[in-house]
A protein has these predicted regions:
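Bacterial N-terminal signal peptides that target proteins for export
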Residues: 1-10
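A short alpha-helix/helix-coil micro-patch that ends at or immediately precedes a cysteine
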Residues: 45-110
């Protein structure tokens, strides 16, 4: 069965661009137009062998702070557009997701282009496969223009599709990264990958 990637259009939030992707194989769209459920037994051919093992503690104070902020949002529950999300379990930091997010953030900054498609035509599942992350559910948020991670996370929480990704109980791991683009009107590009490892 072929892979289906559901995309939402870029949203303008507070004058800054955001874009969200739904998980790779949604069961059906929810009220905000995306689904955040595991792919339900469908085989993805580009999936790398092996299962990524999350790191229990991010390597730096900045990434620990990022993880704490994400998990604070999840613990509080949220209304994403018209959909209410109950509090969700915390996610663990995953170095492979972070690496895939970092490479994509750098690629967007180098091109000065906010996109879920890499300069080589890759999508989020291609990028995590390159980092040997085998997944059962996967989602991606990208943003441009936010100078701090706290502002980027707050922006994603104001956008229904991004918020739904961050609040999804289907995701157990996360990696977030940023890259600067000096001289660009946005200045910073960020990528967040949320996933659950393959069983």
């Amino acid at each position: 069965m072929s892979q289906s990637l559901v995309r939402t259009t870029a949203a303008l939030v507070g004058g800054l661009c955001l874009a969200a992707c739904a998980p790779v194989q949604p069961a059906r769209p929810n009220a905000v137009g995306i689904a955040v459920e595991p792919r339900g037994g469908l085989v993805l051919h580009e999936r790398a062998p092996g299962t990524a093992s999350p790191t229990s503690l991010p390597p730096s104070a900045e990434t620990r702070d990022t993880l704490q902020r994400i998990n604070s949002y999840r613990a509080a529950g949220a209304t994403c557009g018209t959909q209410r999300f109950a509090p969700a379990a915390p996610v663990a930091w995953n170095a492979r997701l972070e690496q895939a997010a970092q490479k994509h953030a750098r690629d967007m900054a180098a091109r000065r282009a906010l996109s879920h498609t890499g300069s080589d035509g890759s999508n989020m599942s291609d990028r995590v496969a390159r980092e040997a992350y085998a997944f059962s559910a996967l989602g991606e948020n990208v943003s441009a223009g936010y100078t701090s991670v706290s502002d980027a996370l707050a922006g994603w929480m104001r956008s229904p599709g991004h918020c739904a990704n961050m609040m999804s109980k289907s995701f157990r791991e996360v990696g977030v990264a940023a890259a600067s683009a000096p001289g660009d009107s946005f200045g910073w590009y960020r990528a967040m990958l949320l996933g659950s490892p393959a069983r």
